[in-house]
């Protein structure tokens, strides 16, 4: 990919739409001041980019101002200011004509616009009612967009998607699995990953913009480190994860304290999941193992079987009797679970 240098731009009252007011104490003045400060700090930001797009920080400002809105920390809202990142998100998911895409937290609709322009039909889930109204108005003339006002981590997304895909297949029998593309609210990233990855019968790819530190913990944890956790076993059980690229924090408003990153999860179809006798029991074993992370498995799994029996199972699985959970790969846990399940 080509590297480009994005330079800061000057924003002044004359460049804004008539709806903007710049009185000393107006909300718009405060919003403009914070955006200008954020942009002045990003003198040079290197990103891989394609063509330019007008749906950038200007439209983000105007959209927020039109609603008198300010990003809410409680909702993890950080709006994208660089339209090229939206293009790259869509590219990472290989979005094309006829795709069905789920977007979580559409915000002002800048990423949504890219997806629709590529020919995708978009279902957006948005918790903030003001943003629901904004994107509903923005895409009112499109038959490729629907937004639901719901808290994603509490909504029945599987039911929504199964109903939608069933209807689509009546008119498009050969339609592919859906995709997820989202600039995710940072405060729900782990919950979203846990919800989406087991849906390989619905989604083929999940492409998310996450905090960089979280992305590295989820995708590239090292064995025998404190970063290696049960969620890493879950991720590799249900998907093939890939860290795509880092997104500097200067590309967001408000500017977060950390950089972000784009991550792709290529979901496995259920028929390709690791062969375990019971998925529920498998993850119960994994979670139990990590509850005593620094303990040997023969101690942390005592509620499942006696220490001598756990040691025996470890031996049959080809693992040392002194094994600890952070030392086991997904395949190791699968072998251990299946040995214990047979006994």
UniProtKB/Swiss-Prot annotation:
GO biological process per UniProt:
response to cold
Its recorded name reads Ribosomal RNA small subunit methyltransferase, chloroplastic
Q: Which organism is it from?
A: Arabidopsis thaliana
Q: Which family does it belong to?
A: Belongs to the class I-like SAM-binding methyltransferase superfamily. rRNA adenine N(6)-methyltransferase family.
Tell me where the transmembrane regions lie.
none
Q: Where is the transit peptide?
A: 1-48
So what does this one do? Required for methylation of the 3' adenosines in the small subunit of plastid rRNA. Essential for chloroplast biogenesis at low temperatures.
The disruption phenotype is: No visible phenotype when grown at 22 degrees Celsius. Chilling-induced chlorosis and reduced growth at 5 degrees Celsius.
A Pfam family that the UniProt record links to this protein: RrnaAD
What are the GO MF terms of this UniProt record?
A: mRNA (2'-O-methyladenosine-N6-)-methyltransferase activity; RNA binding; rRNA (adenine-N6,N6-)-dimethyltransferase activity
PROSITE patterns (alphabetical): RRNA_A_DIMETH, SAM_RNA_A_N6_MT
Keywords of this entry? Chloroplast, Methyltransferase, Plastid, RNA-binding, rRNA processing, S-adenosyl-L-methionine, Transferase, Transit peptide
Main subcellular localisation? plastid
Where in or outside the cell?
Plastid, Chloroplast
**What gene is this protein translated from?**
PFC1
| Residues holding S-adenosyl-L-methionine | 78, 80, 105, 126, 151, 183
